[in-house]
């Protein structure tokens, strides 16, 4: 390696380039990029991708989520740390041998972490996007099954009435708000993984409505929403036949709506 190459690959130089590109956590990102690169040439390729705004998770091909390193590929929704709340709620509610579905699974991050926390559970993931299911297949290899299709239509019919818990991080950004999202998301992540329709709750309505015949007699549905959507989401769950409540994690800025059906509920 030449002196010039060494200088350009130095942590201080990387931090300066990342900071100039607007990376808020330049020091941390520099260390991640250095660890991910095999040599100076590959490092430069990674840095060039990052400084033009490509998400760090796409650049290095992975994200740390819920204590697990989750593989990621471009075109798949990047798991946000706030979504760990969904995992924590699901792990709290599910029995050790539960049948759990990670719906709109994306990378399969939720299901993969739940598989590590509930090793006796049966984990099933589903998504309509073949790139997402390919990625989820990597993360759930040896941990669960992955199906391609539209919401519950992806699942085997034998699962009807047998699901103990559905965890779902469906798109919930209102269409009009997409333009205000950070460029990393707005430009690089597929809009279909972000856009939840006029009020952001189109998919939530479908999931709540279509879930009931698939759920066991005592079961739970857990979905992420925005703070301003919480009350409407709770009402949607209630109208679909769930006892609904809202859970928050202020530290993560996370909000989830939780629906419960007990043994006396009927579809």
Language model region names:
Residues 198-259:
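Conserved Class I SAM-dependent methyltransferase catalytic core
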Residues 82-180, 228:
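Conserved SAM/SAH cofactor-binding pocket of Class I
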Residues 170-202:
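Mobile active-site "lid"/loop adjacent to the S-adenosyl-L-methionine
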Residues 2-44:
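A short N-terminal interaction module
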Residues 27-92:
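Conserved AdoMet
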Residues 69, 122, 144-145, 243-245:
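Conserved beta-strand segments of alpha/beta enzyme cores
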Residues 33, 53, 83, 110, ...:
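Residue-level signal for inorganic ion chemistry
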Residues 262-267:
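Flexible, glycine-/basic-rich loop-and-beta segments that form/coincide
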């Amino acid at each position: 390696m030449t002196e010039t190459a060494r200088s350009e690959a130095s942590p201080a130089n990387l931090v300066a380039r990342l900071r100039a590109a607007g990376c808020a956590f330049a020091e941390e990102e520099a260390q991640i990029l250095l660890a991910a690169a095999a040599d100076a040439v590959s490092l430069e390729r990674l840095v060039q991708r990052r400084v033009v705004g490509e998400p760090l998770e796409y650049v290095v091909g992975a994200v740390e989520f819920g204590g697990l390193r989750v593989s990621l590929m471009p075109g798949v929704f990047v798991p946000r740390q706030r979504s760990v709340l969904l995992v924590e709620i699901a792990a709290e509610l599910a029995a050790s041998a539960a049948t759990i579905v990670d719906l709109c699974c994306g990378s399969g991050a939720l299901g993969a972490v739940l598989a590590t926390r509930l090793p006796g559970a049966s984990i099933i993931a589903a998504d309509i996007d073949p790139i997402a299911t390919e990625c989820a297949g990597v993360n759930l290899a040896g941990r669960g099954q992955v199906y391609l299709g539209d919401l519950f239509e992806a699942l085997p019919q034998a699962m009807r009435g047998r699901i103990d818990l559905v965890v779902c991080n469906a798109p919930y950004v209102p269409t009009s708000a997409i333009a205000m999202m950070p460029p990393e998301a707005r430009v690089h992540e597929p809009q279909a993984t972000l856009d939840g329709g006029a009020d952001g709750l189109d998919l939530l309505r479908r999931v709540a409505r279509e879930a009931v015949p698939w759920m066991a007699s005592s079961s739970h549905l857990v979905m992420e929403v925005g703070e301003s959507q919480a009350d409407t989401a709770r009402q949607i769950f209630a109208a679909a036949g769930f006892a609904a409540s809202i859970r928050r994690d202020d530290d993560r800025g996370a909000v989830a709506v939780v629906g419960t059906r007990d043994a006396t509920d009927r579809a």
